[in-house]
Structure formats: structure tokens, C-alpha cells
Amino acid sequence: DEEDGEMTLEERFSEWSEPXTVQGAVDEAEALLIEKINHXXDVNAKDNLTPLHSAAKTALHAINDDLDMVR
């Protein structure tokens, strides 16, 4: 069962001591995506990255706001 290896959102949050870790994860994911796009030379993928990046930033702000309320 694949789900056994996956952590719940709560478990992942409990491992993050600071929101900056979330930012690091977003940056890392973005860097990996850009690297894949550059290797594949897929022009369309670059266009698709922009809305994805916007969504990631929006989620990051929401997570930071939630963490601020918890403190």
C-alpha cells in the first residue's frame, strides 16, 4: 500500500520548525521543475510553470498565515 509511506499534512507540519523551511521546499521544487524543463527543452512547459509558481506562492502565503495564527 503506497499510502503507508506517505505522511499526513499534520505530520509534515510538525517537522517544520519554521515557515522558512516551507519556503525552502517551494524553492527546491521550483528549481527541480526548471531543471527538468531546461533538460527537456519543452517550450510549452515554461508557460505552464508560471501558473504553477503563482499557485505555490499563494499556498506558501496561506501556510505562513496559518503558522502565524498558531503561534
Curated annotation (Swiss-Prot):
Q: What family is reported?
A: Belongs to the cationic peptide 01 (latrotoxin) family. 04 (delta-latroinsectotoxin) subfamily.
Q: Which GO terms describe its molecular function?
A: toxin activity
- Assembly: Homotetramer in membrane.
Cellular component GO terms, alphabetical = extracellular region; host cell presynaptic membrane; membrane; other organism cell membrane
Is Transferase tagged as a keyword? no
Query: Per the record's keyword annotation, is 4Fe-4S included, yes or no?
Result: no
Classify the main location: secreted
Which residue ranges traverse the bilayer?
Answer: none
Q: In which tissues is it expressed?
A: Expressed by the venom gland.
Q: Which UniProt keywords apply?
A: ANK repeat, Cleavage on pair of basic residues, Exocytosis, Membrane, Neurotoxin, Presynaptic neurotoxin, Repeat, Secreted, Target cell membrane, Target membrane, Toxin, Transmembrane
Q: Which GO terms describe its biological process?
A: exocytosis
Q: Outline the ANK repeats, range by range.
A: 25-36, 37-45, 47-57, 58-62, 63-71
Q: What is this protein called?
A: Delta-latroinsectotoxin-Lh1a
Q: What else is known?
A: Iso and Leu residues are assigned by comparison with orthologs.
Question: In the UniProt entry, what is the domain comment?
Answer: Two helices (H2 and H8) are predicted to insert into membranes and form pores by assembling into tetramers. The helices are contained within a helical bundle domain that undergoes significant conformational changes during pore formation to allow exposure of the transmembrane helices and transition of the toxin from a soluble monomer to a transmembrane tetramer.
What's this chain's function?
Answer: Insecticidal presynaptic neurotoxin that induces massive neurotransmitter release at insect (but not vertebrate) neuromuscular junctions. Native toxin forms cation-permeable pores (with high permeability to calcium) in lipid membranes locust muscle membrane and artificial lipid bilayers. May bind to insect neurexin-1 homolog, insect adhesion G protein-coupled receptor L1 homolog, and insect receptor-type tyrosine-protein phosphatase S homolog, and induces neurotransmitter exocytosis both by forming tetrameric pores in membranes and signaling via G protein-coupled receptor.
Q: Where in the cell is it found?
A: Secreted; Target cell membrane
